Amino acid sequence: MKSKNNKFIAMSIPFILGTALGIYVESTYYFTSIINQKSFALPDTQIKHYSIPELSRRNVSTCFTPPAGCTKFIVQQLEKAEESIYMQAYGMSDSLITTALINAQMRGVKVKILLDRSNLKQKFSKLYELQQAKIDVGIDTVPGIAHNKVIIIDKKKVITGSFNFTVAADKRNAENVILIEDQQLAESYLQNWFSRKASNSVHF
């Protein structure tokens, strides 16, 4: 009798596992389908929609590394700033970008920066150099890592992408930079900047 029960259990296990796997796969497919159909979305206050035709009418430029050259691309845009530069950065150790920010401050451009907390201990971070130049620098503290790479220029240009503002990003890594000239998009990024500044930053 015991032998028959063991045989029944042994035969049942594959069936149970197979059924469970089938339910899992079917459920995964169902929820993936829902997400792909955009039935699931963040609240409208947290997500902005821009159609491809809409963006195609904007002035959009891109830069990729390798080869090197995206730092120069960013510096050129910073040199064109007339009124304001708002930056969010995880890594901030590139001398050329730092110099461009300081020069902008010296010619009367409002420069405000939010950096990840790692810059407090990073050996090559330009945090204190920026601070000494009287630039408004804040540390984005919570939650987690402040991994944004964003520059908003004159409230009408947005530079973003994977590119940290470091030498490694320009010389060693495979990175991308995108520049979009659009006032509505810039406003969206600015709102996020001020939100981060108000709730999650330590001011020097």
From Swiss-Prot:
Domain of life of the organism encoding this protein: Bacteria
Name of this protein: Phospholipase D
Gene3D superfamilies on file: Endonuclease Chain A
GO molecular function, one term: phospholipase D activity
Residue stretches making up the PLD phosphodiesterase domain: 142-169
Active site per the UniProt annotation: H147, K149, D154
Gene label: pld
The species this protein was found in: Rickettsia typhi (strain ATCC VR-144 / Wilmington)
Signal peptide (from-to): 1-22
